[in-house]
């Protein structure tokens, strides 16, 4: 039997705990209300669409067709308008080149309200770092994306793509349309495994396969968390099955990366192994990071190495998958452009069996079509920043430091004040002459300014090799009954996949 004084003590503790929770909850509410007041006051000069009393604009921007709704708002509210995710997170949503230049030519940090969700997986890598630490990492990583490093990757892109195309050859024999998205995703992730760790389909052990599945899982789970407001609170999220699944996948990914780093560092202590690695046809991303030193001869810590490897895997997987899938959809939708691209790459390939690095620079028309597909379907439709200092825009309106900015790339790319007939697929927009006349911040598929995508040359090189090989092997056409439905998440996906008809071309079309 529990003594009465202990019962009273437990009761008192319970009351104290309940009281403390109520006080903390009240203080949190006060903090949120003050933050809303600050954000709302900062944006009071910017009219915008009406908000829901509880959800702000969240319900509208999660609906099918929400991207085009934002485009319609852009017509109604030139330059920018407030965009509220619930009642406490408000961004100034911008979609005009001069407004974009005012913010993205600087180097303000990513908005923590969005990007802090990524920390559990990718840590503090280049995507979320700021200040001197970001600058140090940017300088250390830049040599890893130099042309001389990228050149040997053409063979890696070719190898992974050929595996995918052989699968498509079998599927195409059935004479029915099929969804290409998962196969493209598998190919893109397989390519990254080879370029990051020197692994691939020919050498995936159990540990590598588990990592491969974990990265796929983490990407999907992160997408789902971003659009599910009940998951935005960390404490609540980690208690849910969704959150626990995310943590398990994180552990698998981190264990794999840590072990590969340990093994590679140990191997590099052996001079023979080190020379063998240095003489390979290409250095993988991990080798480059391990050899990176700044001007003070300081190298990346193990935690930094893991963060940058995980960031590279995250940023380079879904974006590439999205870009390739939407491009092939555009080719199916516009067969005249598909035909012209195919003829160009056939002429470039000639009697060769494979594309060489120098061939990529000759793919003029294919590159213009890739860029036009990026304009209409940017792989990352929206990015976010937090102002580190005040900004004054071209029309005289301003925002204070601490304000949140949403750069709506999709709406920018369909802004009729910038792009005549924005819904029309016109590859000639990206001819040298036309591109030179355009505002430098009118086209931002890889963001812009000092914090632009460090891997854009890697991505464009992969896009060219993959799409050229696809067009040489198959003729793509639409399935009118299953057209893609745009679904904006962290990357631009299709709600129902990308169902295309593929017609194998004759021998010699793709070597």
UniProtKB/Swiss-Prot annotation:
The modification Phosphoserine is found at residue 436. Belongs to the cytochrome P450 family. The keyword Cell wall biogenesis/degradation does not apply. Heme binds at residues 315, 453. One of its GO terms (molecular function) is monooxygenase activity. It comes from Homo sapiens. It holds the Pfam family p450. Induction: P450 can be induced to high levels in liver and other tissues by various foreign compounds, including drugs, pesticides, and carcinogens. Changing residue 345 to I: In allele CYP4B1*6. Keywords: Endoplasmic reticulum, Heme, Iron, Membrane, Metal-binding, Microsome, Monooxygenase, Oxidoreductase, Phosphoprotein. Its cofactor is heme. Signal peptide: none annotated. GO terms for biological process: biphenyl metabolic process; fatty acid metabolic process. Changing residue 331 to I: In allele CYP4B1*2, allele CYP4B1*7 and allele CYP4B1*5. This is Cytochrome P450 4B1. CDD domains: CYP4B-like (cd20678). Its EC number is 1.14.14.1. InterPro entries: Cyt_P450 (IPR001128), Cyt_P450_CS (IPR017972), Cyt_P450_E_grp-I (IPR002401), Cyt_P450_sf (IPR036396), Cytochrome_P450_Monoox (IPR050196). It is a peripheral membrane protein. The gene is CYP4B1. The keyword Acetylation does not apply. It is found in: Endoplasmic reticulum membrane; Microsome membrane. It catalyses: an organic molecule + reduced [NADPH--hemoprotein reductase] + O2 = an alcohol + oxidized [NADPH--hemoprotein reductase] + H2O + H(+). It comes from the Eukaryota. PANTHER family: CYTOCHROME P450 4B1, CYTOCHROME P450 FAMILY 4.
């Amino acid at each position: 039997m529990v003594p009465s004084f202990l019962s009273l003590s437990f009761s008192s503790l319970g009351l104290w705990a309940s009281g403390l929770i109520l006080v903390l909850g009240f203080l949190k509410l006060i903090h949120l209300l003050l933050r809303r007041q600050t954000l709302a006051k900062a944006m009071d000069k910017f009219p915008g669409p009406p908000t829901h009393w509880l959800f702000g604009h969240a319900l509208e921007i999660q609906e099918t067709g929400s991207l085009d709704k934002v485009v319609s708002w852009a017509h109604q509210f030139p330059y920018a308008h407030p965009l509220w995710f619930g009642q406490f997170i408000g961004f100034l949503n911008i979609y005009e080149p001069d407004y974009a230049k005012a913010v993205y030519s600087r180097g303000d940090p990513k908005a923590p309200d969005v990007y802090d969700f990524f920390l559990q997986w990718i840590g503090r890598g280049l995507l979320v770092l700021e200040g001197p630490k970001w600058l140090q990492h940017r300088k250390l990583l830049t040599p890893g994306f130099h042309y001389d490093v990228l050149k040997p990757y053409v063979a890696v892109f070719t190898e992974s793509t050929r595996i995918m195309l052989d699968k498509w050859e079998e599927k195409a024999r059935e004479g029915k349309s099929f969804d290409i998205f998962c196969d493209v995703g598998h190919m893109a992730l397989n390519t990254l495994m080879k370029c990051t760790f020197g692994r691939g389909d020919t050498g995936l052990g159990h540990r590598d396969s588990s990592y491969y599945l974990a990265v796929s899982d983490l990407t999907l789970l992160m997408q789902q968390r971003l659009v599910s407001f009940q998951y935005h609170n960390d404490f609540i999220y980690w208690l849910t099955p969704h959150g626990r699944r995310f943590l398990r996948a994180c552990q698998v990914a981190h264990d794999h990366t840590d072990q590969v780093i340990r093994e590679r560092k140990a191997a590099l202590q052996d001079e023979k192994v080190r020379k063998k690695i240095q003489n390979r046809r290409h250095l993988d991303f991990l080798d480059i990071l391990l050899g990176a030193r700044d001007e003070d001869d300081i190298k990346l810590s193990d935690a930094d190495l893991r963060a940058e490897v995980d960031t590279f895997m995250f940023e380079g997987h879904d974006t590439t998958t999205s870009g390739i899938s939407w491009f092939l959809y555009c080719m199916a939708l516009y067969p005249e452009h598909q035909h012209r691209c195919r003829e160009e790459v056939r002429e470039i390939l000639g009697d060769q069996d494979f594309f060489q690095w120098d061939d990529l620079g000759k793919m003029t028309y294919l590159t213009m079509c890739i860029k036009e597909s990026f304009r209409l379907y940017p792989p990352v439709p929206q990015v976010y920043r937090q102002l580190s200092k005040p900004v004054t825009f071209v029309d005289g309106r301003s925002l204070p430091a601490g304000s949140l900015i949403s750069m709506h790339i999709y709406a920018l790319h369909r802004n009729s004040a910038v792009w005549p007939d924005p819904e029309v697929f016109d590859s000639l927009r990206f001819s040298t002459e036309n591109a030179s006349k355009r505002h430098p911040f009118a086209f931002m598929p890889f963001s812009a300014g000092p914090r632009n995508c460090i891997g854009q040359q890697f991505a464009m090189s992969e896009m060219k090799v993959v799409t050229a090989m696809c067009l040489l092997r198959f003729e793509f056409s639409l399935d009118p009954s299953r057209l893609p439905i745009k679904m904006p998440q962290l990357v631009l996906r299709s709600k129902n996949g990308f169902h295309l008809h593929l017609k194998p071309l004759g021998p010699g079309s793709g070597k």
